[in-house]
């Protein structure tokens, strides 16, 4: 997939005529190829400002790097170290004013779609439960 590093990989959405007839999510999210292409736009900054904008301090460069490499299990593990609700946060967290708002890529072009990548990782883990390690109860 050809990637313009200044532009986000577009996210697929329901056609407006179809979505007017249902209550399904409008945004379909990324598929594997789209997620890897979007992740390849990340500059993997040493002093990652995106992490400073994340209220739960997810190691964003590390999980995005794993998405770029196609290791979605590792990406999920990294996100899960800080967030118990990645599928929710990937949908409702105001990324444009938090992590994506601090993304260096956004100074010239579009910031990396961190929220959409988080959503992709969480949805992929949920669809493939074998990717998720569930710890034994502690009590």
List where the protein language model places each region.
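Local cysteine-cluster metal-coordination motifs and their immediate loop/turn environment
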Residues: 40-59, 86-107
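Ferredoxin-type iron-sulfur electron-transfer modules in oxidoreductases and energy-metabolism complexes
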Residues: 20-37, 59-91, 108-131
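Residue-level detector of conserved catalytic or cofactor/ligand-binding positions
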Residues: 130-138
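Short, contiguous pre-domain boundary segments
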Residues: 7-26
């Amino acid at each position: 997939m050809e990637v313009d590093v200044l532009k986000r990989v577009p996210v697929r959405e329901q056609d407006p005529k179809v979505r007017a007839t249902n209550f399904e999510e409008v945004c379909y999210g990324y598929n594997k190829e789209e997620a890897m292409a979007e992740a390849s736009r990340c500059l993997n900054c040493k002093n990652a400002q995106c992490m400073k904008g994340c209220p739960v301090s997810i190691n964003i460069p590390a999980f995005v790097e794993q998405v770029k490499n196609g290791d979605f299990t590792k990406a999920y593990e990294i996100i899960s170290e800080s967030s118990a609700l990645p599928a929710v946060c990937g949908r409702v967290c105001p990324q444009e004013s938090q992590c994506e708002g601090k993304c260096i890529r956004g100074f010239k072009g579009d910031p990396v779609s961190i929220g959409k990548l988080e959503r992709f990782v969480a949805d992929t883990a949920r669809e493939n439960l074998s990717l998720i390690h569930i710890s034994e109860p502690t009590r």
